[in-house]
Curated annotation (Swiss-Prot):
Catalytic activity entry: 7-carboxy-7-deazaguanine + NH4(+) + ATP = 7-cyano-7-deazaguanine + ADP + phosphate + H2O + H(+)
Keywords, in A-Z order: ATP-binding, Ligase, Metal-binding, Nucleotide-binding, Queuosine biosynthesis, Zinc
Protein name: 7-cyano-7-deazaguanine synthase
Gene behind this protein: queC
Cofactor(s) of this protein: Zn(2+)
Family statement drawn from the similarity comment of this UniProt entry: Belongs to the QueC family.
Residue sites binding Zn(2+) per the record: C188, C198, C201, C204
Disulfide feature: none
Function, as annotated: Catalyzes the ATP-dependent conversion of 7-carboxy-7-deazaguanine (CDG) to 7-cyano-7-deazaguanine (preQ(0)).
Superkingdom to which the source organism belongs: Bacteria
Organism of origin: Legionella pneumophila (strain Corby)
EC code: 6.3.4.20
Length: 228
């Protein structure tokens, strides 16, 4: 069976990617990261999801938190803002996060003989993160095949971002068709230890709107009820 490394945060998008990779016949090696994120309930969710979806393996890699300063997701002194429409890159941006995660996934993939890496990046319904853009994914794939023994020898890597052009509504519809239990997932930027979402951050807003517009019951446990 062909292998794939799937970046699994424990959120809605990455869980949908895991389900999609499995539906395509991959043995899925889930990879999660502990990098000092305040929403560490995601990692508990990732563990539940990997087990529930029968991943071939699930690794949680601990990174030095000093690598990720200046973000509301890693610095408790920076407040996570409520949702606001804006063209600016928000304070929830984590410096070079997807670059680092994909680099780690690439090394892991080459070591286990996997040539496919899945990431839940989307350029629709997102918060203007530069490392979620199609140009970034394409550039990293080029890098992967220039920087590895496998790539140089013609055994090329593919960076799969199947949600790249899907809205949150379409992602939820896809996941529902694949049988994803979204009640296991945690997307909130500041979920509490019980995994309850704030209902007010960007991630909560996109998620809540997505379920409503998709006509799918929202299984998220919210700390606060807000009208979206």
């Amino acid at each position: 069976m062909k292998k794939a490394v799937v970046l699994l945060s424990g959120g809605l998008d990455s869980t949908t990617c895991l389900a999609l990779a499995k539906s395509q016949g991959f043995a899925c090696y889930a990879l999660s990261f502990s990098y000092g994120q305040r929403h560490s309930a995601e990692l508990c969710a990732a563990t539940r999801i990997a087990k529930h979806m029968d991943a071939a393996d699930h690794k949680i890699v601990t990174l030095d938190t000093a690598l990720f300063g200046g973000s509301a997701l890693t610095d408790a002194s920076i407040e996570v803002p409520e949702f606001k429409e804006s063209p600016e890159i928000p304070v929830t941006y984590v410096p070079a996060r997807n670059t680092i995660f994909l680099a780690m996934a690439l090394g892991y993939a080459e070591s286990i003989g996997a040539r496919d890496i899945f990431i839940g990046a989307s350029s629709v319904d997102y918060s203007h993160y530069p490392d979620c853009r199609p140009e970034f994914i394409e550039s990293f794939q080029s890098l992967a095949n220039l920087a590895t023994k496998a790539g140089i020898e013609g055994d090329r890597f593919t960076i799969n971002a199947p949600l790249q052009y899907l809205s949150k509504v379409q992602t939820i519809q896809l996941g529902t068709e694949l049988g994803v239990d979204y009640g296991l997932t945690v997307s909130c930027y500041q979920a509490n230890e019980a995994g309850e979402a704030c209902g007010q951050c960007d991630s909560c807003t996109f998620r809540k709107r997505g379920f409503k517009s998709a006509g799918v019951n929202d299984p998220t446990r919210y700390q606060k009820c807000v009208h979206i």
